[in-house]
Amino acid sequence: MLVLDFINVGNGDSILVREMEGERLRFSMLVDCGHDSLERDDHPPVEDPRSCRIFAGDFLRSQGVAHLDILLVTHFHRDHIGGLGRVLETVTVGELLTPYAPPADSGPLDPDGDNGLPKAARNVLRCMDLYAGPLRRYGDRIGRIKELPGDRMECLRLTDDLTMDILFGEPALYPRQKAVYDAAFRGERNGYDLIHWGKSMNVSSLRQRLYYHGREIVLGGDAYAHMWETQTATPCDILKVPHHASLSSTTRKLLRLLQPKAAVVCVAAGRPDERPHPYIVSLLKEFTEDVHFTDAVEIPGLVEPVFHTSVHIELP
């Protein structure tokens, strides 16, 4: 049985994939680690006592997961990698799959130091520091780090019954990403390059397609619809909607290609930036009534709040 938990990390993504044989865990993978906070400074605080938000590391502990065969990072925004430290405090990892691996001797980036960089450039450094710092501190808890080149689709057989394709954006993005981050770790901090890359992070987001017993699960990361709606996409059973169901996350054209039977939106309730966007939620409901939200999202007349620590799906 394949067990999927789209964890309610509040603002962010973290998805636990497990293959079970009875009560025995055969395989486990975590895709992204959520945010380093259950709330954001620019979002209203959680006032509902029924809130079930949980850090990814704490969710793993609650499920008795002490080891991940694979930890996959889609990209380096704070709401996807901020929880890495808590995850590595909780579990050991067989293999980390990532679009960028910091140099082995890399030190802190000190994004808040007196570096003369604009705020947007500092934010890029801060996100990378939240990723690289735990790798330094807990590197002995990771068996292997594999940097994915991004120039071709990666096809992995995870178990006898479970396979995964890892899909990328434009191939030219990933050498550029490496050049910008490597320069930052060398102390060469070009504000323009950092800001420009910060605007490219979502379009570089990895996507995954899982295959299990004739079912297909698409995990869209933060990839905007226009980046992959022109590609050959086949119908899927479950779609993790890209980019928190923002207005740029999906289109009618993409949904016609994917034809999801169920959709999951990883998003915090009460966001002031229309994520999830009501139009996108309406569009999703045109294709499937089976639309789930990780947090207790409420859109009058469209979505009623549901309080849970994860959207839990089991596939025999």
Question: Across the structure, where does each feature detected by a protein language model lie?
Answer:
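Internal alpha/beta domain cores that form substrate/cofactor-binding pockets in large enzymes
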Residues: D79, S106-D110, N115-N123, W228, ...
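Active-site metal-binding loops of divalent metal-dependent hydrolases
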Residues: V9, D32-D36, F76, A101, ...
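Short, conserved, surface-exposed binding loops centered on an aromatic residue
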Residues: K199, R209-Y211, E229-Q231, L254-L257
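Flexible, acidic/histidine-containing loops and adjacent segments that form or flank the divalent-metal
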Residues: M1-L4, I81-V218, E289-P316
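Conserved beta-strand hairpin/beta-sheet module of binuclear metal-dependent hydrolase folds
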Residues: M1-A66, K199-Y224
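A short, polar/proline- and glycine-enriched secondary-structure boundary/capping micro-motif
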Residues: R40-D42, R176-K178, M227-T232
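Active-site metal-binding motif and surrounding structural segment of the metallo-beta-lactamase
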Residues: M20, R26-M29, H35-T98, A233-S246, ...
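Short amphipathic alpha-helical segments and helix-helix/interface helices
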Residues: G57, L84-L88, Y131-L135, E229-T230, ...
